Amino acid sequence: NEVFVLAHELGHAGHFYLAHKNQNLFNARPSTYFIEAPSTMNEMLMANYLLSNSNDPRFKRWVIASIVSRTYYHNFVTHLLEAAYQRKVYEIIDAGGSINAPKLNEIKRGVLEEFWGGEVEIIDGAELTWMRQPHYYMGLYPYTYSAGLTISTQMSQRILKEGEPAVAQWLEVLKAGGTKSPVELAQMAGVDVTTEAPLRETIAYIGSLIDELEALTAEIEAAEAVK
């Protein structure tokens, strides 16, 4: 499982290396909005490689389960809910209100209940999870994971379909560093983040992963039934 973490952090390392190699000190650092695109792209590239080089349904199921539970659930759900929570906290402060630990607990629980509705039971203590998240002390950071993952999902699919030309285009994006705005960087990758289309397409891709996960499980269970 930690291989996905290693791939993620190497994505940051490769991004910063290329940006600093091709830009000056003042232009090298990219926008925070884009910062998690290269890291999550590495997770997607590794997963695609593992899937394309194995015929073992159990292994492929593990890879897809890892993508869904780590790459997508962690970045698309956990961090996005943290961003929603952070927004509500800032709205109170901007309106001249004050907060304390019980209030923060109340807000966190409200965000969880609003998102999950009646589908998931929110147990006692779930509202305390805001206490362990260092990203809250890094400015408006949590939302960048879902933003970056939307871009990397679209680009990784292009690499699968187009091959080397898409790879070369992505390397140019990484080399650009902070010389382009987030919208421009995404456009260089062929992704228009000014519309909701990339987000909807990414959600549809997650749905296709779930379908594949179910198909692999059915295949495994059918094989076991024959034994």
What is each PLM-predicted segment?
Residues 1-9:
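Short alpha-helical catalytic segment bearing the HExxH-like zincin motif
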Residues 2, 30-34, 60, 100, ...:
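Conserved acidic
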Residues 3-4, 24-35, 74, 137, ...:
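Alpha-helix N-cap/helix-initiation motif
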Residues 6-7, 14, 41, 52, ...:
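C-terminal, non-catalytic "cap/extension" segments appended to globular domains
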Residues 19, 29-59, 68-70, 74, ...:
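Post-HExxH zinc-binding segment in Zn-dependent metallohydrolases
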